[in-house]
Amino acid sequence: MERRLENIVSRRELQAWWNDEALSPPADQGEEQGKVGPIDEEELLKASRYQFDVWCAGYNWLQSNRQSALDVRDYIENTVLPFYQKEHGLDPEQVSRMKVILVTHSMGGLVARALTQLHGYERVLGVVHGVQPATGSSTIYHHMRCGYEGIAQVVLGRNAGEVTAVVANSAGALELAPSAEYREGRPWLFLCDAQGQVLKDIDGKPRAYPQNQDPYEEIYKSSTWYGLVPEQNAQYLDMSDKKESLRVGPRDNFEDLIDSIAKFHGELSAAGYHSETYAHYGADDSRHSWRDLIWKGDPTPLETPGATLNDDENGTYNSWFRRGLPTIVQGPLEAGNPLDASGSGGDETVPTDSGQAPALAGVKASFRHGSKGKGQANTKRGYEHQESYNDARAQWAALYGVIKITQLADWHPNDKGGT
């Protein structure tokens, strides 16, 4: 990115990539809202007056994104901006007008939104979000009940116990769970019989959760066999040797943490997005992203009073005496998901439902990449979550956002407001 942005113009002539590719219509690159036009030469000439140094701001993903946002603010204020006064000798008044553009990946989007929208930090000119789990990701439920898959399990946990011991005590990780706004509050956790039909509760309502748009009480705090931390996994909520002396039990601490997650989600949703926000995300039906979490099997033995619950911590309940107990399987529902199919697929981590949330919230532009996207660039498969910025479509969308945001900059001497 830095190399591309530092070579926009030479002798007032656009360099090859900018002239050949950057000027194409956003719709060709998967832009789905139709509110923005192509970059023009004047915009590129203005952008070329600025220096685009790329600074990497890390954060602790275990702590709340609210706190991580403050850490990023301190990094900008104490390291990034002072650098240009100390090392480049810029005038203090000019430095005081300088702002940054945030380019985020995944969870970093939540950090950036907390920074600008919750803390009101004003030295951000605009934001480019990449593959942000904007309203959460149901993948976290799968990981806490089954462990991670593939090579990731070596580091992040191979079963429910290993994952729960860390994630259930980590605000930042739990803030990745689906919020009340995920899929507009509609169900994403389904209890089905062996034939794939959604079961009914004693009131005749489908056992599809959340039933009442409250995943915090219905799923995350629930100690039932299908809860995020069922009773048999409560032992992993506190792995220390001091449990006996604690005044408040591990389950109580966990529920307090869930309450703080709900508060964070609610405040972030109400605060919206920075006024200059551009987003891109993967939306490919071949990238299974655990959109529907389905427990398939007969739960009757698990719901019998006094029953001893046992599961293999990889998503399957077991018993010496009963077969066909619930196991987690991939969606979609065999009986047909009554929900809109527009949110299916994703990038193997963030479901389309969550990736498309910024567009639904009305950000400046949103690029949908993969089989569910449109435009000439979407003739190939959508990208995988971790590798997103290695894809030319994500790179194009990010550069487009940066150039558009730069039009608001005013601290160069040749720009309005400059010195």
Report the location of each language-model feature:
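A Trp-anchored, charged/polar loop motif used as the substrate-binding/catalytic surface
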Residues: 5, 12, 33-39, 69-91, ...
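Alpha/beta-hydrolase-fold enzymes
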Residues: 152-245, 257-265
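Proline-rich intrinsically disordered, low-complexity coils
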Residues: 25-26, 38, 82, 92, ...
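C-terminal subdomain of alpha/beta-hydrolase-fold enzymes, centered on the catalytic histidine
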Residues: 220, 228-419
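N-terminal non-catalytic accessory region
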Residues: 1-103, 107-161, 184-187, 191-192, ...
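Noncatalytic linker/hinge segments flanking ATPase motor cores
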Residues: 142-145, 166-177, 319-327
